[in-house]
Amino acid sequence: MVEGIVFEHVSKKFADSIALNDVSFAINKGEFFSLLGPSGCGKTTLLRILAGFEKPDQGRILLDGQDITKLPANKRPINTVFQNYALFPHLTIWENIAFGLRIAQRSETEIKREVEQMLGLIQMKEHGHKKPDQISGGQKQRVAIARALVNHPRILLLDEPLAALDLKLRQKMLLDLDRIHDEVGITFIFVTHDQSEAMAVSDRIAVLHKGSLEQIGNPIEIYEMPKSSFVADFIGDTNFFDGWVKETAQKEYSLVDVEGFPQIYCFNDKQLSKGDAVHLSVRPEKIHISREQIQAHPLQNVFQGIVDDVIYKGDHTHFGIQVGDRKISVNQQHSRFLLDEAPIKWKDVVWIWWHSDDGFILERCQKLENNNE
């Protein structure tokens, strides 16, 4: 028996709109798993199908080997935390957490034990007597999580639970969610459109786009080894190049002719031939910048350019560097700051460089007219 959740060929339409298109993947038991994508990608629909609030048009859902596709929502060992908290304003925090236990007709001794345990888990033992309007937004979210966990579900669904919180509070709640997950050990499924949230807490991430699964992997795989242009662009910033394979070097690397730009060496894990049209990506933080000319090493990309944009962002400075017909984004991290160090300025002539391992071929493009042969 496979432990965890399995989606098998799940499809869903609303009128003429395709919400999910033949989606298949598995979530391991006990994982902190994120469904990530822009609005309308299908992530919330997938969550609602798992919760039992929607039925798929095709496909099925397995939980620990059992088909739960037709099981009513109230029969599934799954609880959901929503963005709006949905706390009862007339009940205390203690009573809000106890509500589900009372519905289940648990004994008062058991209710007291479970509620006190949950208050300890969310670090709010001293707030049990308060009403929801007497606590902060972050505390309300923790109470909503405790209320969802008190009945010991096998799966907790989190539907954009941090969207209403400010930045600092979201960062604090992410740490709380990670800690709570580690302590309770059940499967958490986290829906978000915020890449940084998913990257911070997830064991694995499923990236969805227009109802289809683009990629699934751990945060490092998703960021460093995107499988498509959409994933590379949605997860952080990147520079894209279209070109043709001119030659292969040492099997793992290709030299690519790029229109309006010098040739680029890049990592290649695909079966490509000379003349193939390809799509390349290199992250701005992988590119180095200097006023001094750099001696190019084998398989290193070194180019001269002119600074067109300079934007100071605190922990790093963003540069737009004009090289040939292209403007290249470069992010220089600030490992130290010296008052007497002359900063790179607008219209400065600079050198930028990156190793071929830091640029990668995402996919083949449709055949372009190649005048380089």
UniProtKB/Swiss-Prot annotation:
Enzyme category, top tier: translocase
Q: PROSITE patterns from the xrefs?
A: ABC_TRANSPORTER_1 (PS00211), ABC_TRANSPORTER_2 (PS50893), POTA (PS51305)
Instruction: Name the catalysed reactions.
Output: ATP + H2O + polyamine-[polyamine-binding protein]Side 1 = ADP + phosphate + polyamineSide 2 + [polyamine-binding protein]Side 1
* Gene Ontology CC: ATP-binding cassette (ABC) transporter complex
What is the protein's membrane topology class? Peripheral membrane protein
Q: Which residues bind ATP?
A: 37-44
Say where the protein is mainly found: membrane
| Cellular compartment(s) | Cell inner membrane
Q: What GO terms are given for molecular function?
A: ABC-type putrescine transporter activity; ATP binding; ATP hydrolysis activity
Q: Indicate the segments annotated as coiled coil, or none if absent.
A: none
Describe its partners and assembly state: The complex is composed of two ATP-binding proteins (PotA), two transmembrane proteins (PotB and PotC) and a solute-binding protein (PotD).
Q: What does this protein do?
A: Part of the ABC transporter complex PotABCD involved in spermidine/putrescine import. Responsible for energy coupling to the transport system.
Q: What is this protein called?
A: Spermidine/putrescine import ATP-binding protein PotA
Q: Give the species this sequence originates from.
A: Protochlamydia amoebophila (strain UWE25)
* Lineage, broadest ranks: Bacteria, Pseudomonadati, Chlamydiota, Chlamydiia, Parachlamydiales
